[in-house]
């Protein structure tokens, strides 16, 4: 049965989180591993198994080449794929694997199927990246009800129980992206006034700074470049992330990686002390990159720093002391610490899911488009139709004309960005309008219309007012996925889910078979008096059948289950004989006809078929283990 819950998902660069509305409040869902966040990591093992989340992260050092991290940084990149043993995966497919695990864990938590979700994206994601995220959700088998900006979602989690009018600034530094948004809150209305950011700045870059420092120091000391060793590099990455986290609460940490490499003389170890001061000097250029977007967002909103009532920090990277110091320096006030930076976005997404599902009333979300949208006109100029920070959904149109006499076609090239020359912005898509009646240049009237829906997805149309000819395009993101491609990827995702289920079944069948053999041998040894030669021979033959299938690498799971069932049936005979002998002993024991255990006692006249199946009881105990 499908749940009516709409899942709120924070699909992060480093970690993801998910939540639902429960009793009027958003609640984080604990995943299958018992954690409140799930690493956004996917791995493929040598035997073809696919791991997602913590299991994938835990084996990354042993399997660096087939472990994929931070795929979010490549969303919307048409040319990027991951090659695993000759099979190529798009960022949408890898993200869908993470979303599949989230969906499965949520279903286990709720006890029902989950079909619908609200997924968050960085506020500064362009249209391609948003569409790619939506495609990933569909590949994972989710109906994506809404794409919501992460800072907006965080503000919803912050303001759910506060009806006062206030202006907040959300400073969101995640694993791979940085966003800053200014919002006006009040009376259940969440209005984004301005947003800015950097899609290529995040906690991963702080990790990379430590990795660079470690690799340089080690090369200077030992003449070995650890970056050329994939396994050593993975160990550096894990150590860098751990050191960054430790330095948020300590002034100094020791990075100790024994046996990091080897020379002809033997193993070489890595050990360096890193102080917080040194770490902050290594990353000063990174934290400084957050200043300009923050100041620009304030300027675009028409506010000064004194107009901001509260500053909300979002993203695990905001736990770094240098972030707190920089925010106070820019805005002159201490950030709010009542919001969990790892969970706020998922909680806000769940609230938006509650709004869409009718569980939450009196909340209105007014988001904005982060970048200007327009087309290329004569001379390669970028003509804006929708300005950045326009509240969505929205639509705008403008009349254009031809540049040459007797021109019968025009090419409409759609761009997103803030540069004056079209080619310096992001090309989202293009199409051709044909069938324009020949006329002098400047005569035809061609209406170009832009429409942005509530997910920030763009539709563009062009119509020749004279002939009525029209064309339109929905800007596709990522690899430009068609419905057929999404369907194909959904089938592949479902196929992998079936493969995982079949692999689990095979392991369970093997475990059950080995357990049955062990139980059989124990029962034969402990119940010699209850087993005649014929039954012993039958059981031993059944044991041999099971062992033969266990040793046969080509045997199917069905075969293994069949021979195990045959052995279990033979073992039932031992159980029946044990109960029969026990009943007979009780019937003929001391106490006479009316005493305990006598003719009128329990079991005196019972038929063997009335006894509980002994082996079935043993099976249940084994299953519980």
UniProtKB/Swiss-Prot annotation:
InterPro entries with a match to the protein in the record: ATPase_NBD, Chaperone_DnaK, Heat_shock_70_CS, HSP70_C_sf, HSP70_peptide-bd_sf, Hsp_70_fam
Region described as Disordered: 463-532, 576-625
Feature: compositional bias, Basic and acidic residues: 487-513
CDD domains: ASKHA_NBD_HSP70_DnaK-like
Compositional bias segments (type: Acidic residues): 523-532, 606-625
UniProt KW Transmembrane keyword: no
Keywords noted in UniProt: ATP-binding, Chaperone, Nucleotide-binding
Transmembrane helix among keywords: no
Disulfide bonds: none
Biased composition, class Gly residues, residue ranges: 588-601
Molecular function terms from GO: ATP binding; ATP-dependent protein folding chaperone; unfolded protein binding
Pfam families assigned to the protein according to its UniProt record, in alphabetical order: HSP70 (PF00012)
Family: Belongs to the heat shock protein 70 family.
Main function: Acts as a chaperone.
Name of the protein this chain belongs to: Chaperone protein DnaK
Source species of the chain: Haloferax mediterranei (strain ATCC 33500 / DSM 1411 / JCM 8866 / NBRC 14739 / NCIMB 2177 / R-4)
Gene: dnaK
